[in-house]
Amino acid sequence: MAAGTSNYWEDLRKQARQLENELDLKLVSFSKLCTSYSHSGSRDGGRDRYSSDTTPLLNGSSQDRMFETMAIEIEQLLARLTGVNDKMAEYTHSAGVPSLNAALMHTLQRHRDILQDYTHEFHKTKANFTAIRERENLMGSVRKDIESYKSGSGVNNRRTELFLKEHDHLRNSDRLIEETISIAMATKENMTSQRGMLKSIHSKMNTLANRFPAVNSLIQRINLRKRRDSLILGGVIGICTILLLLYAFH
């Protein structure tokens, strides 16, 4: 019976790790899609993306369709991972050994933290993508109105020229801001990856220490002996220094 329940727990952990790996890859691609969408809008200048009056989500550009598809896939993966975490929680409550329960709860909390981080990252990237698309819609509409005004009136007065120059200046500033945001997002991805690696190393060290108390005790004794040797060495150096000073000023 114990072997069966242990296998069930390991199967749940395996499913959770597999879903977490899939979500990590999906979120990286999702973030890159958001960045490429922004750069594409800057290069196009709003001319090709807004050839019609409306740009619905599913009938717009290929990037819009890809965004919708990836968002649905990530939401499904998050839902599946949530279900696996719920099953793991039920298992921890049904387990009868207190010491085993503590270890299981620690593992469950770690998977819950990962799920929370992935959910937060998904919603943040999705909101950024929506904001960029709305801004591109607005800029494209302004560009279209300007072109319509120029073609309709046929007059290039100084006010229109100044407005166009100001518009181009704003677009250049917006592009610089987007590039800065892209660099920041890439840096955040690297920091998130490093944090995950550190968490994994810390968890493995804790697991090793819990499984092998003798190793943990040996490490503690080594650390105590190092501190003791450092104190002795410091005392010897201090005494020698005092003796040298007394000898020098004698």
Swiss-Prot record:
It comes from the Eukaryota. Its main location: Golgi. Pfam families: V-SNARE_C. GO terms for cellular component: cis-Golgi network; Golgi apparatus; Golgi membrane. One of its GO terms (biological process) is endoplasmic reticulum to Golgi vesicle-mediated transport. The chain crosses the membrane at residues 230-250. InterPro entries: Golgi_SNAP_su1 (IPR023601). Belongs to the GOSR1 family. Involved in transport from the ER to the Golgi apparatus as well as in intra-Golgi transport. It belongs to a super-family of proteins called t-SNAREs or soluble NSF (N-ethylmaleimide-sensitive factor) attachment protein receptor. May play a protective role against hydrogen peroxide induced cytotoxicity under glutathione depleted conditions in neuronal cells by regulating the intracellular ROS levels via inhibition of p38 MAPK (MAPK11, MAPK12, MAPK13 and MAPK14). Participates in docking and fusion stage of ER to cis-Golgi transport. This is Golgi SNAP receptor complex member 1. It comes from Mus musculus. The lineage of its organism: Eukaryota, Metazoa, Chordata, Craniata, Vertebrata. The gene is Gosr1.
